[in-house]
């Protein structure tokens, strides 16, 4: 089960999720939001692999464990899960009606981020500090991207959530 959970933070799963969300945003003519989501996740990916190259920390040596060929610090699964799921969670809160639904989306994003990170330690491919660093850097990057998105929305450079220019009247509300 831990390997199933850890796969939720894999590049394959995150790329499919990114493609699905961006496809949806483009269909409802939220090009600015789509660009911000892509920029957030691609930026997080570049930062993650840049930090791996900088620190080049070896992984834990577990006989018979999962073979991984990149450096250990920081955990890309933990970092990119934080960036992706927290960004999408906040995106959903911008269109969700009611505090309960907003709390659900943020709670789900945090839960996924935490269990994916913990699974990396459990399966023996990271030290706890790798995961903690991934969570911290990923959360900080996601927060910075949210601030940029809010400023761009206030300036009118990115469309406000909840409005749609789709001809058939489809809205994301």
Question: How should these model regions be labeled?
Answer:
Residues 1-71, 87-94, 107:
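Hydrophobic alpha-helical bundle signature of multipass membrane enzymes
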Residues 60-173:
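Membrane-embedded catalytic cores of phosphoryl/pyrophosphoryl-handling enzymes
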């Amino acid at each position: 089960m831990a390997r199933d959970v850890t796969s939720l933070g894999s590049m394959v799963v995150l790329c499919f999720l990114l493609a699905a969300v961006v496809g949806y945003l483009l269909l409802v003519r939220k090009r600015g939001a789509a660009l911000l989501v892509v920029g957030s996740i691609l930026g997080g990916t570049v930062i993650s692999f840049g930090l791996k190259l900088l620190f080049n920390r070896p992984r834990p040596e577990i006989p018979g464990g999962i073979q991984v060929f990149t450096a250990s610090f920081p955990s890309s699964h933990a970092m990119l899960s934080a960036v992706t799921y927290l960004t999408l969670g906040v995106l959903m809160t911008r269109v969700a009606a009611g505090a309960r639904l907003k709390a659900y989306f943020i709670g789900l994003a945090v839960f996924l981020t935490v269990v994916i990170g913990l699974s990396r330690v459990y399966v023996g491919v990271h030290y706890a500090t790798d995961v903690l660093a991934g969570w911290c850097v990923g959360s900080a990057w996601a927060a910075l991207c949210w601030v940029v998105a809010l400023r761009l929305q206030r300036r009118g450079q990115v469309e406000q959530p909840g409005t749609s220019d789709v001809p058939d009247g489809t809205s994301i509300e």
